């Protein structure tokens, strides 16, 4: 096992409990922390979620059952964690929390390796104050109340934990923010035959300690205990991986196809950047066909490029690989693709109308992107009323694709120019009214 000497740490740390038997997942043939959901093992997903949620301190992974395999996976994948072996793990996961504490800073998160959360839930937890904070969900969507630990709440505090509470107000979401000095007082409660994390929580309440409730209020999360849970968890992850800024074409048409493509890409070595390049290549090929007068085939490839353009973001969000650098890379390729498609359609049409409509169409496409980028750089997030119909790339590409498929390139270019320039003008007028 790796070196276990205590070192100095900055910020909030985390203990990831990964020592249990995972008996109902044994048919998968690997330790539970190494079961895969949407392209990542449960352990990788937990570590990436914590980091993406803003956790900066050391992450301690506590192993027990088949611990050498889990530790080897951490090393092979280059996970930035400290692995700590807990020989006492058969007594319960409470012993894993105690085993991790001496390697952790004063405030730390306790995360279950078999619970899947979004980074936003971690951010919400880290904003809470208290010696013991529990993430709870009063409006669970994915988690099974028959499997999860239930909680009873009073005045924003958890007053009771239990699997079989007849009356309860929410579910324990398996994510906690704790104070190490406070929990050290519970070591004296650790001498029994069994010591689960629920036992420690109840001991904390019995000692007069308060458990602050951090309500996730319907945020997507679930716990994974069975092969069926693995499948349901992947559906959940793909559901939240869709962009929240979809236009109507993406929302009602493209996502239904891109999600199926992304599902097949999750366990491949393809990166989101490579998928961005694939989308650009399809757009460039479609533009070339449009310029050569092959309008129907070119239009079909333009729409396919639009569908694949959604896969890079889905893949990045599902694998927790999103980054500002990747967003800039994708946006730059998109602008080049737009210019090629509009130019190709204008050239391939061979009419004065299409040639004349090419410039305003290209200007409108670029201005929609440019005004949004400048707005958000100077003023923060653009209000959703300025990112609707005509201001989304999916609509623009659908109009251009239809122009090729229906043999109406001039009309498609005129519509694209009108939509884009009208939206850019609307944004400018809104800014002017805001200054006056």
From Swiss-Prot:
InterPro entries: CDP-OH_P_trans, CDP-OH_PTrfase_TM_dom, CDP_ALCOHOL_P_TRANSF_CS, GlmU-like, MobA-like_NTP_Trfase, Nucleotide-diphossugar_trans
EC number: 2.7.7.74, 2.7.8.34
UniProt keyword annotations, A-Z: Membrane, Multifunctional enzyme, Nucleotidyltransferase, Transferase, Transmembrane, Transmembrane helix
Annotated region described as CDP-alcohol phosphatidyltransferases, given as residue ranges: 242-435
Membrane topology value: Multi-pass membrane protein
Highest taxon, organism lineage: Bacteria
Region (MobA-like NTP transferase), start-end ranges: 11-241
Enzyme class, first EC level, given as a word: transferase
Molecular function GO terms recorded: nucleotidyltransferase activity; phosphotransferase activity, for other substituted phosphate groups
Any single GO CC term annotated in Swiss-Prot or TrEMBL for this entry: membrane
Biological processes annotated in GO: phospholipid biosynthetic process
Primary localization: membrane
Family affiliation: In the N-terminal section; belongs to the MobA family. In the C-terminal section; belongs to the CDP-alcohol phosphatidyltransferase class-I family.
Protein name (record): Bifunctional IPC transferase and DIPP synthase
Organism the protein comes from: Rubrobacter xylanophilus (strain DSM 9941 / JCM 11954 / NBRC 16129 / PRD-1)
Lineage of producing organism: Bacteria, Bacillati, Actinomycetota, Rubrobacteria, Rubrobacterales
